[in-house]
C-alpha cells in the first residue's frame, strides 16, 4: 500500500511539473507581428486561412533562414565559453542556479523549480535570480557541444518561469510598499520577478539566447510563439519608462 501511494504521489508531481513546462501555441503572436514585413508572406497567408500551427512553423522557418542578423553581445561564428560559464550551465541543468557571487556555492531551487525560494532574506538574491544568468552559458554550451540536453532544459525552464511568474496587476502603493509580511504570493513575487532592472536584463540577454538556441529541435514552433509573446510583454513596461 505504501509503495502504491508513493507511486501515485510521484506520478502526480511529474504531471504537475510537465504541465508547468508544457508548450502552447500562442495565436496572439500574429497580432503582435508586422505580417507585411518582407519574408513573412507565407506566415500571413496561413494565419489568414486559420492555419496557425502551420503559420507558426513557417515563422520558425523564417527566423532560421535569416542570414543578416547581428548579435552584438556574442559572435555566433565563434562561440566561446569560460570554465566558470560551463559550470553555471552544468549546474543549471540540475536547477542549481548561479545568482550572485556573494552567495556561493549556489542554491538549488528544486526539481519542480521554486522561483519564489528565498534562502537568505537578501533582496539582491531574489531579484537577481530572475536575471537568469545561467541561460546564456547554457546556450553557449549547446552551440559548442551540440548536446541537446542544454537546449531542452533551457526551453523547459523558460516556459516554467513564464507559468510561475505571471505579471499580475498591482497598484503603485503595493509595488512601493516596504516588505512587512502583508504583501505575499504573486503580488510579492511581481516586485522581484518584474522589477524594471530585471526585465531590462532579460530583454537584452534573450536576444543572444534566441539566436543560440534557434537551431535546436527543442525550439519548436509552439515555443517560438511563447517566446515572442513573453518578449513583447517584457518590452511594453520598459517602453513606458523611457
What are these regions (language model features)?
Residues 1-23:
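Bacterial Sec-dependent N-terminal signal peptides
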Residues 2, 15, 60-62, 127, ...:
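General helical secondary-structure elements
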Residues 17, 22, 34, 50, ...:
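Short, flexible coil/linker elements and helix-boundary hinge sites characteristic
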Residues 23-94:
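Extreme N-terminal leader/anchor segments
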Residues 121-240:
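Aromatic-lined, polymer-binding surfaces characteristic
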Residues 97-116, 128-129:
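Short alpha-helical hairpin
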Residues 8-11, 43, 63, 175-178, ...:
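Extended hydrophobic/Leu-rich segments
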Residues 55-56, 79-81, 90, 108, ...:
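Intrinsically disordered, low-complexity regions enriched in Ser/Pro/Gly/Gln/His and often acidic
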Amino acid at each position: 500500500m505504501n509503495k502504491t501511494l508513493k507511486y501515485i504521489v510521484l506520478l502526480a508531481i511529474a504531471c504537475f511539473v510537465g504541465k508547468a513546462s508544457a508548450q502552447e501555441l500562442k495565436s496572439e503572436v500574429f497580432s503582435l507581428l508586422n505580417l507585411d514585413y518582407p519574408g513573412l508572406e507565407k506566415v500571413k497567408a496561413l494565419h489568414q486561412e486559420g492555419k496557425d500551427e502551420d503559420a507558426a512553423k513557417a515563422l520558425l522557418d523564417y527566423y532560421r533562414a535569416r542570414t543578416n542578423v547581428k548579435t552584438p553581445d556574442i559572435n555566433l561564428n565563434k562561440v566561446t565559453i569560460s570554465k566558470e560559464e560551463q559550470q553555471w550551465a552544468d549546474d543549471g541543468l540540475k536547477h542549481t542556479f548561479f545568482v550572485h557571487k556573494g552567495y556561493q556555492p549556489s542554491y538549488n531551487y528544486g526539481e519542480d523549480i521554486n522561483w519564489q525560494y528565498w534562502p537568505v532574506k537578501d533582496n539582491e538574491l531574489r531579484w537577481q535570480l530572475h536575471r537568469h544568468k545561467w541561460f546564456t552559458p547554457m546556450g553557449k554550451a549547446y552551440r559548442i557541444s551540440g548536446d541537446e540536453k542544454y537546449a531542452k532544459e533551457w526551453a523547459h525552464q523558460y516556459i516554467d518561469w513564464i507559468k510561475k511568474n505571471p505579471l499580475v496587476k498591482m497598484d503603485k502603493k503595493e509595488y512601493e510598499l516596504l516588505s512587512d509580511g502583508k504583501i505575499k504570493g504573486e503580488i510579492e513575487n511581481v516586485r522581484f520577478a518584474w522589477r524594471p532592472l530585471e526585465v531590462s536584463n532579460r530583454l537584452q540577454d534573450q536576444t543572444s539566447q534566441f539566436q543560440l538556441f534557434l537551431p535546436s529541435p527543442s525550439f519548436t514552433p509552439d515555443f517560438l510563439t511563447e517566446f515572442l509573446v513573453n518578449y513583447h510583454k517584457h518590452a511594453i513596461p520598459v517602453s513606458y519608462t523611457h
